[in-house]
């Protein structure tokens, strides 16, 4: 695995200043991954590992939110951060045919911010008061949270993206939160059931968009967000 991480760092050539904090490092990686390729919700790489994603992106390919997040999470890992991809899904994910899921990244910043959600496709993080938000925190604070770019500036939705209102676009996706117990190099190879956070009174979905059977274990938030 270390060999892959070294190759990924060398291929990406992200300029991380000496002494950069975990947060600064994560945001620089996020900016790189966000700008690595144009978004195309219907295009997939020939293989789901991050080196293939980056090589094909450098050759001009465009990919989905999945590839933005998988690339960014592994680049964060390559630069010494704890990171993972997070599948966020709407309440009706089991019955919708399309557009019921989105993929983001969470990285562990430390004592000040804890786990931080970064939407690599959008190029943003969320903040409530002074604290950057995890996906779970944002599901509760989204009405009042601010959305900012990886450069710390206020986020302005690109024309034609996110329906012109990113928070309202994102809101329904924060219903189910699902992650693998560990970050896998090949995105689609998960030998273990995923962990999922389910709102009180509901149950985990059995399918993703009608066709893909889900293998999920419901856990408490302290387990989901353990370090």
Language-model features: locations:
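Secondary-structure boundary elements
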Residues: 1-63
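Intrinsic-disorder-associated interaction segments
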Residues: 1-4, 22, 131, 135-137, ...
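Extracytoplasmic/periplasmic, Sec-exported soluble proteins
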Residues: 17-25, 57-68, 96-97, 127-130, ...
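Long, hydrophobic/aromatic-enriched structural stretches that serve as scaffold segments
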Residues: 32-39, 67-71, 75, 79
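Enriched - but not universal
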Residues: 40-41, 77, 118, 172
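Detector for Asparagine
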Residues: 40-43, 87, 184
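Hydrophobic/aromatic-rich core segments of domains that either
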Residues: 70-146
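Alpha-helical and coiled-coil interaction segments, frequently adjacent to or embedded
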Residues: 141-227
């Amino acid at each position: 695995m270390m060999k892959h991480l070294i190759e990924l760092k060398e291929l990406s050539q992200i300029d991380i200043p000496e002494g950069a904090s975990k947060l600064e490092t994560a945001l620089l990686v996020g900016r790189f991954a966000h700008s690595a390729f144009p978004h195309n919700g219907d295009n997939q790489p020939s293989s789901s590992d991050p080196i293939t994603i980056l090589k094909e992106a450098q050759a001009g390919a465009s990919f989905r939110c999945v590839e933005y997040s998988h690339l960014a999470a592994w680049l964060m890992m390559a630069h010494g951060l704890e990171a993972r991809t997070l599948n966020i899904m709407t309440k009706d994910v089991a019955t919708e045919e399309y557009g019921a899921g989105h993929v983001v990244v969470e990285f562990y910043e430390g004592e000040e911010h804890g786990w931080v959600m970064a939407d690599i496709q959008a190029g943003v993080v969320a903040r409530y008061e002074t604290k950057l938000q995890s996906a779970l925190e944002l599901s509760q604070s989204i009405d009042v949270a601010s959305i900012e770019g990886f450069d710390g500036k206020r986020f302005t939705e690109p024309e034609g993206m996110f329906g012109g209102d990113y928070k309202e676009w994102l809101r329904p996706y924060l219903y189910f939160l699902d992650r693998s117990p560990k970050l896998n190099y090949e995105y689609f190879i998960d030998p273990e059931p995923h962990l999922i956070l389910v709102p009180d009174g509901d149950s985990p979905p059995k399918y993703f968009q009608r066709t893909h059977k889900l293998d999920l274990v419901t856990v408490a938030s302290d387990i989901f967000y353990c370090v």
